[in-house]
């Protein structure tokens, strides 16, 4: 029989150390074009989170190809992605320390092929007719904003990249046609983000390798075009949201034709480079992934019939779709399984798990599977979320007691809740804390209209949806309405602080590298996001009053609930001063506050020790504020101005009286 213990105090086999050190983080994925294709991918491994390059030939196990002192990662746009390119037997990667391109062989050490200090590279494509790379570059040598453009790099020459296209603020997805005569790419300008409005271009490649006869194919200030790819027979395909959802199109005879029209997104917001959702098995067959409110699905699309046929795979989170003539490889995850590198044989349906993000299984008896909910929110709208109820076969809560709720506001804010198994969520549900992962208005995966609910309303719509989601579950009787909490990172951290400053629903908050001062963020953040707030809040200086009204730093008087903050001191996306100003203001206002800062961490913690310490500090903070005693041995966290409520095991601090 299960023991009866208060929610939050259940003992769990899912420890903070397991969450921090038990999983690797897959990044880029590539597939060879042979009959039995080779797979290559990058993976960040604990404890340091350094990205290793892994190579897996057919009928062999994976082996590390690039390891320390290298770290396979690009910092273009700060978020990176597209640090790997496999072109036949050639493997190229970007090294984090110097941001230069290297080439590596099966039995040879990496060799640097660029000598361009102060420049970063990403999202390369191979021009086999000219034996060169065409790559997105970001030049940080001058004063002011870095300069983005497309460069050509000849691996055998080394040295200086040559600019072949420039003049726009941003570039992505250069792709050479199969016959080598044309180049396609995407560009956009301030103040747009690529999911707001972007343009797809093609140009002829002249004999000397320069670009001529540029032609705009699609895109506008109100149309987002992403992921250009050439079919084997030379037709340009892409994804556009011109009809309200990111759907597949092609460009034939100088006309744009829809390939699939449905209320589903065949792309995700391109925060990072080179995360494709489709590819070609042949000129007549596309393998793709798309998302609805029920999660991601894999499918086959006939380019002649324009018919979509679902492919049954046991995953609801699908990324990095890479296609060869008889195979598709992808990153797949579900609520029951952590992310894997999977390979599917298209003719037989044989599915092979090539690599796992974590070794060893979590006992399924301790896993909480999410329920998809749609709940009423402000202005007659509905919003979406994933509900995880407490699950632990060893315990149940006391009769009449309901569990506390942990509401999660995802980052971005133009992003979405993951459908893969997340030990960071199971850590809480296995201890008796319910979780609501909110896809608030502005999230991706529900079409352009849902994304644009946040236009001009960041700090309002997202907050209202988190508040109303929590209220919905409390009124339904699922959770304890007096123990509602909220957690968020980055943009989600801003949502946390706004929810605490402008509403009285949540008992406490957890803020990871969150935004507290919108004007400061607009002034200090990096180029890629430097005009993001124009759409989310309004243009400066015209809307300076709105920035002030929405910034939690100016509303400390309304924020009287305990908050714990976490910050990486090398964060260039949300600089540390955003957290430090808020912590200082709350301390002066005598609001209960705790703050943990981490040397060497950037935007999104990567080191296992950091992740473990932060998660344990959260649990300690929850116990002190909500009044339960965690079963874990926990290092104490200094909490300023928290009225004493006794101590619990592992707490070495002196409670305030």
Task: Cite the ranges covered by each PLM segment.
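Residue-level detector of Asp-centered blade-edge/turn motifs that repeat once per structural unit
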Residues: 33-35, 86-88, 127-129, 178-179, ...
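Multi-bladed beta-propeller domains
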Residues: 1-25, 57-79, 104-120, 150-172, ...
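Hydrophobic or amphipathic alpha-helical targeting/insertion segments
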Residues: 91-106, 110, 122-126, 130-133
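Cap/lid segment of the alpha/beta-hydrolase catalytic domain
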Residues: 141, 191, 357-482, 489, ...
């Amino acid at each position: 029989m299960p023991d009866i213990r208060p929610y939050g105090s259940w003992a769990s086999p899912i420890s903070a150390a397991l969450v921090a050190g038990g999983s690797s983080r897959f990044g880029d994925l590539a597939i060879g074009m042979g009959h039995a294709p080779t797979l290559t991918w990058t993976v960040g491994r604990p404890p340091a989170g350094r990205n290793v390059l892994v190579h897996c030939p057919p009928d062999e196990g994976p082996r590390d190809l690039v390891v320390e002192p290298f770290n396979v990662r690009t910092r273009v746009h700060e978020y990176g992605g597209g640090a790997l390119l496999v072109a036949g037997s050639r493997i190229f990667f970007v090294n984090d320390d110097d941001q230069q391109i290297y080439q590596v062989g099966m039995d040879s050490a990496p060799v640097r092929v660029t000598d361009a200090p102060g420049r970063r590279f990403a999202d390369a494509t191979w021009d086999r007719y000219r034996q060169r790379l065409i790559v997105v570059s970001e030049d940080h040598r001058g004063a002011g904003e870095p300069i983005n453009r497309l460069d050509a790099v000849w691996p055998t020459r080394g040295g200086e990249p040559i600019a072949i296209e420039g003049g726009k603020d941003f570039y992505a997805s250069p792709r050479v046609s199969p016959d080598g005569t044309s180049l396609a790419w995407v560009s956009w300008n301030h103040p747009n983000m690529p999911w707001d409005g972007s343009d797809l271009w093609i140009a002829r490649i002249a004999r000397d390798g320069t670009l001529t006869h540029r032609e705009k194919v699609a895109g506008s200030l109100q149309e987002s075009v992403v992921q250009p790819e050439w079919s084997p027979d030379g037709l340009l395909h892409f994804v556009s949201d011109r009809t309200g959802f990111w759907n597949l199109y092609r460009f034939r005879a100088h006309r744009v034709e829809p390939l699939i029209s449905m209320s589903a997104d065949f792309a995700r917001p391109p925060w990072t480079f080179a995360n494709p959702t489709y590819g070609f098995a042949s000129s007549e067959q596309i393998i793709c992934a798309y998302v609805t409110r029920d999660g991601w699905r894999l499918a086959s699309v006939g380019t002649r019939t324009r018919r979509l046929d679902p492919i049954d795979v046991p995953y609801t989170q699908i990324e990095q779709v890479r296609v060869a003539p008889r195979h598709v490889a992808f990153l797949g995850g579900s609520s029951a399984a952590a992310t894997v590198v999977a390979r599917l044989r298209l003719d037989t349906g044989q599915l092979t798990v090539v690599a796992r993000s974590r070794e060893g299984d979590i006992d399924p008896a301790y896993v909480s599977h999410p329920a998809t909910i749609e709940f009423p929110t402000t202005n007659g709208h509905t919003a979406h979320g994933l509900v995880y109820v407490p699950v632990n076969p060893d315990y149940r809560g006391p009769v009449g007691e309901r569990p506390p709720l942990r509401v999660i506001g995802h980052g971005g804010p133009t992003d979405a809740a993951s459908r893969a198994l997340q030990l960071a969520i199971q850590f809480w549900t296995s201890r008796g804390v319910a979780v609501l992962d909110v896809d608030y208005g502005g999230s991706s995966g529900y079409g352009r209209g849902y994304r644009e609910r946040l236009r001009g309303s960041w700090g309002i719509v997202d907050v209202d949806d988190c508040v109303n989601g929590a209220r919905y579950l409390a009124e339904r009787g699922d959770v304890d309405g007096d123990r509602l909490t909220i957690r968020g990172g980055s943009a989600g951290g801003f949502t946390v602080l706004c929810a605490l400053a402008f509403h009285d629903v949540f008992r406490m908050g957890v803020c990871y590298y969150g935004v507290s001062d919108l004007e400061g963020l607009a002034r200090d953040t990096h180029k890629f996001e430097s005009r993001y707030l124009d759409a989310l809040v309004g243009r400066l200086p015209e809307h300076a009053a709105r920035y002030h009204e929405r910034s939690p730093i100016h509303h400390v008087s309304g924020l009287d609930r305990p908050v714990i903050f976490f910050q990486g001191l090398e964060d260039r996306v949300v600089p540390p001063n955003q957290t430090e100003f808020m912590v200082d203001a709350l301390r002066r206002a005598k609001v209960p506050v705790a703050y943990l800062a981490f040397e060497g961490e950037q935007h999104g913690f990567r080191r296992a020790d950091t992740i473990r310490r932060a998660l344990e500090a959260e649990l300690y903070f929850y116990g002190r504020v909500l009044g339960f005693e965690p079963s874990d041995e926990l290092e104490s966290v200094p909490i300023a101005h928290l009225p004493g409520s006794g101590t619990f095991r592992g707490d070495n601090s002196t409670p305030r009286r």
